[in-house]
Amino acid sequence: MKSVTMNEEMEKKSVTEDPERDVLEIGQMRYNYKREGSPLHVKSYAFAVRIVRMFLHLTGDDAKLMVIYRQVLKSGTSISANVHESEFAQSSSDFVSKLSIALKEANETDYWLTLLHESEYISDDSFVSIQSDCKELIKLLVSIIKTAKGNHNQ
C-alpha cells in the first residue's frame, strides 16, 4: 500500500485570490464574493474543487478503492451544493435544513478523508491541508446554523 502525495500545485492549481476586488479565481472561473455569495459559499465551492481534483488524482492510483473515492467525491461536493441551495430557501426552517445537510456532508467527508489518511492513501501533508479546510467549513456551518436557529426562535 502506498501513500499518495498530492502535488500542492496540482491540488490548488489556478486558485488565486484578489482581496482588493473580492475575487477568487478557480481555474477559468472568476468568483466574486460580494456578488455571488458569502465566504461560506466561496469556501465550500473552493473545497469542492479540491475534492474533485483529489478524486481525479487518486482514481488513477488504485481502482480497488473506487467506492471510497466516490463517497469522498459525493459528500465533499454536496457541501457546496447544499450551501448554494440554501441561498434560495423558502423559509428560515428550509435554510437551516439545507445548511444542516451541508454540515452532515462535511462531517462525512472528514470521516472518509481520515479513513484514507489512516489507510495510508493520502499523505500527511495533503491530509492536514484538506482536513483543515473541511474543519473550517464545519465550524462556519455550525456557527451559521446556531445563529439562524437563534434568530428564528426570537
Regions found by a protein language model. Give the residues of each.
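Short, C-terminally biased terminal segments at protein or domain edges
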Residues: 1-81, 85, 89-154
